[in-house]
Amino acid sequence: MAKNVIVVGTQWGDEGKGKIVDWLTDHAKGVVRFQGGHNAGHTLVVGEQVYKLNLVPSGIVRDGVECYIGNGVVLDIHHLLSEIAELEKGGIDVRSRLKISPGCPLILPYHSAIDKARECAKSEDKKIGTTGKGIGPTYEDKVSRRGLRVYDLFNPERFAEKLKEVLEYHNFVLTQYFKAPAVDFQTVYDQAMADAEQIKPLVTDVSAALYAANKAGSNLLFEGAQGTLLDIDHGTYPFVTSSNCVAGQASAGAGIGPGMLHYVLGITKAYCTRVGGGPFPSELDIETEGAPGYQMSQVGREFGTVTGRKRRCGWFDAAALRRSGRINGLTGLCITKLDVLDGLKELNICTGYKLDGKIIDLLPIGADEVVRCEPIYETMPGWTDTTFGVKRWEDLPVNAQSYLNRLEVLCEVPIAIVSTGPERDETILKQHPFK
């Protein structure tokens, strides 16, 4: 009988999901993206080769694994084709194994133009830190029922008709409100039609394909992007992404019933990071040499895969993780980047907050309350021996084991996996999600 696993980020993204998805794919016949777009950045290290993926599911680097892009993903086809070309240069067979839902909303040039113009117009304290890829405006078009989808590409006359209508609206906003240049209809149309010819062989009823694979007994892995605290409904709104990043979205964003989902693995760093604006209760100074935040930033190489921006760093926030655990219904946790904490004399864990004179043990909903939270810390001793590359639990320093055990208790979720480095075999397994 098939067993299907969802991998989700439990923080503000960048938790190391790509490596874990790649590692778990050894037990899966298919890997599915179900939300987000090319604002996601997954880095995989396989031997000497480093792969940086935005849209193509991480399972593509495993021979014989089918990869699916579900209807919940917003798709920049031009970017996808570039990504495919890069993978093919490295000798990876992509086109025979990649399947794209015809229901994916299309990201077109006017979406990124709106995205960038809108962010530029905001004051510094209101900036979300968008990647400028057009993700948000594409989701807006989807819910306002004016967006174009992959299936529209294959009816050129109807595509042109819809494009003229939506472009008239967006160009009015660009030129009249943002005082930005208009986007040319013919340029957008010609590029879309050229891309359509290349993408057509990959378009498949993904929902039906996943149902058939599950019925045939194939294990499936659902690969989340971003993180729970960036979720449009459950994150630190409005400093969030434009999609649902939680486990429940795997069902809607891939077109499968929730009864087909069996295990939810939450990925979290051994500390916290965040890119862009928004509240971050346990944030540390990352600029002062020798400070814990500086070590996290430098040793952890905390720079965004997509934007290259410095990530903000802070202590592990168990109160935030507790919220993520409940929203996602986590079955198990995977802790990544434990080695980044090697050498710190003491480690703090945020166990709750002081908010308006009260003590709470769960991250509040919405940015307005989160920004007023003062972290409450529990201090634990650090360790001097390295954890990098350790492959057995018993070989971890005693204090590292104690730290992880405490996280497990505070988060109310058992630890299934500990990642101790970027390579596939730099992994400690306590409970296999597929077994």
UniProtKB/Swiss-Prot annotation:
Keyword Metal-binding, does the record have it?
Answer: yes
Binding positions for Mg(2+)? D14, G41
The protein's matches in PANTHER family, at most eight in alphabetical order, are given as:
ADENYLOSUCCINATE SYNTHETASE
Q: Which domain of life is it from?
A: Bacteria
Some GO term, biological process aspect, for this entry: which one? Answer: IMP metabolic process
- This protein's name: Adenylosuccinate synthetase
| Pathway field | Purine metabolism; AMP biosynthesis via de novo pathway; AMP from IMP: step 1/2
Q: Name one Pfam family in it.
A: Adenylsucc_synt
Query: What catalytic activity does the UniProt entry give for this protein?
Result: IMP + L-aspartate + GTP = N(6)-(1,2-dicarboxyethyl)-AMP + GDP + phosphate + 2 H(+)
Which residues are listed for IMP binding in this entry?
D14, E15, G16, K17, N39, A40, G41, H42, T131, R145, Q226, T241, R309
Q: Quaternary structure? A: Homodimer.
What the protein does comes down to: Plays an important role in the de novo pathway of purine nucleotide biosynthesis. Catalyzes the first committed step in the biosynthesis of AMP from IMP.
Q: Which GO terms describe its molecular function?
A: adenylosuccinate synthase activity; GTP binding; magnesium ion binding
The question of whether Cytoplasm is a record keyword is answered with yes
Top enzyme category: ligase
Q: Quote the gene name from the UniProt entry.
A: purA
Note the NCBIfam families from the entry. PRK01117.1, purA
Q: Name one GO cellular component term.
A: cytoplasm
Instruction: Give the taxonomic lineage as stored in the record.
Output: Bacteria, Pseudomonadati, Pseudomonadota, Betaproteobacteria, Rhodocyclales
**Which residues are GTP-binding?**
13-19, 41-43, 311, 337-339, 419-421
Q: Where in the cell is it found?
A: Cytoplasm
Enumerate the residues binding substrate. Answer: T305, V306, T307, G308, R309, K310, R311
Family membership = Belongs to the adenylosuccinate synthetase family.
